[in-house]
UniProtKB/Swiss-Prot annotation:
Official protein name in the record: Chaperone protein DnaJ
PANTHER family per record: CHAPERONE PROTEIN DNAJ, DNAJ HOMOLOG 1, MITOCHONDRIAL-RELATED
Residues binding Zn(2+) 1, per UniProt: 137, 140, 189, 192
GO molecular function: ATP binding; heat shock protein binding; unfolded protein binding; zinc ion binding
Domain of life: Bacteria
Gene Ontology CC annotation, any one: cytoplasm
Gene: dnaJ
UniProt source species: Xylella fastidiosa (strain Temecula1 / ATCC 700964)
Length: 368
């Protein structure tokens, strides 16, 4: 069966850059990787095809040979080049699927989300959390063996991986004899069935520092899942989710809030009290204050969890229209409104005057 064109395999043009090749290979490998498609022979074949195509096209010398001679360039061998390290591309996405020593493995990382009120996030808090996880089997002490005896795998010699030669390419894959463990267990533990780990719940006390924000993560080293065969456990990542607050909205270390005032307060000026994180504060509103005016209270925001500097509190004035008026109040407002009649009204409502002038100018242009 003839091989497909390497560029076609990765879905890129022949002018593709090194970065384009890397992105295309990453998409292809993640789609067809055997760990995501267990038992799917077609996916495994597609994965190998993608890997072979990338190893050639990502190497400058090999790509030049391929562009000139096609697949025939490699029928009798090919010179060595700077073939990219697959581990550099994927890191830990598939747990070093392309190689690496068995001793470098560790347990899986665990994620946990904790919800806080804004006040808790600002001040810091200590929380007790309970997480489902895999822990070391106490019956076999993590060995997976009922009698504690394990044999080094003779196929991979304890590495958990075997080297496969496919033409000019050498690949590492999980040892089929020991399943990647590097050891053979003849008498599996009756409690964990040879896994060396059992499901359990772990209770931890997590100290959340003052100033954390929505999406911040706290890493607890070694508190993740216990690794197989006694290898170190992974880490626990506690992600912070801050609930919406009825008064404040947070923007980094700054806080924002709306301060409702009456029309009379905005027109005549007044002193209003506003809530802050550490009590009340006063804002002096000058006469003729418009809705939307911002007042800044320095240092009344959130103390940064990283720099220990404090943000500010921004208070936005909202001039409220009075509701549920009495007959007397309505009469007074009607009398007040009459005082704005005529040309003098423009000087009392500059924004309205500007708006009306703009509307008139617009219609004049439309009808001219």
């Amino acid at each position: 069966m003839s091989k497909r064109d390497y560029y076609q395999v990765l879905g890129v043009p022949r002018t593709a850059s090194e970065d384009d090749l890397k992105k295309a290979y990453r998409r292809c490998a993640m789609k067809y990787h055997p760990d995501r498609n267990p038992g799917d022979a077609a996916a495994e074949a597609a994965f190998k095809e993608c890997k072979e195509a990338y190893e050639v096209l990502a190497d400058t010398k090999k790509r030049k040979l391929y562009d000139t001679h096609g697949h025939a360039a490699f029928e009798h061998g090919v010179g060595s080049g700077n073939t990219p390290d697959m581990n550099d591309i994927f890191g830990d996405i598939f747990g070093n699927i392309f190689g690496g020593a068995r001793a470098s493995r560790r347990g899986a990382d665990v994620g946990y989300m904790v919800e806080l009120d804004l006040e808790e996030a600002v001040a810091g808090v200590e929380r007790q959390i309970q997480i489902p996880t895999l822990v070391e089997c106490t019956h076999c002490h993590g060995s997976g063996s009922e009698d504690g005896h394990v044999e080094t795998c003779g196929t991979c010699r304890g590495s958990g991986q075997v080297r496969i030669q496919r033409g000019i390419f050498a690949m590492q894959q999980t040892c089929p004899h020991c399943g990647g463990r590097g050891v053979i267990i003849r008498n599996p533990c009756k409690v964990c069935n040879g896994a060396g780990r059992v499901e359990d719940h772990k209770t931890l006390s997590v100290k959340i520092p003052a100033g954390v924000d929505n999406g911040d993560r706290i890493r607890l080293s070694g508190e993740g899942e216990q690794g197989p065969d006694g290898v170190p456990p992974g880490d626990l990542y506690v992600e912070v989710r801050v609930r919406e607050h009825p008064i404040f909205q947070r923007d980094g270390d700054d806080l924002h809030c709306e301060v409702p005032v009456r029309i009379s307060q905005a027109a005549l000026g007044d002193i209003v009290r506003v809530a802050t994180l550490d009590g009340e504060a006063e804002i002096r509103i000058p006469a003729e204050t418009q809705s939307g005016k911002l007042f800044r209270l320095r240092g009344k925001g959130v103390r940064s969890v990283r720099s220990r500097t404090e943000g500010d509190l921004y208070c936005r004035i909202v001039v409220e229209t009075p509701v549920n008026l009495t007959a007397e109040q309505r009469k007074l407002l009607e009398q007040f409104e009459m005082t704005f009649a005529g040309e003098d009204a423009r000087k009392h409502s500059p924004k309205s005057a500007t708006f009306l002038d703009g509307v008139k100018s617009f219609w004049d242009r439309m009808t001219s």
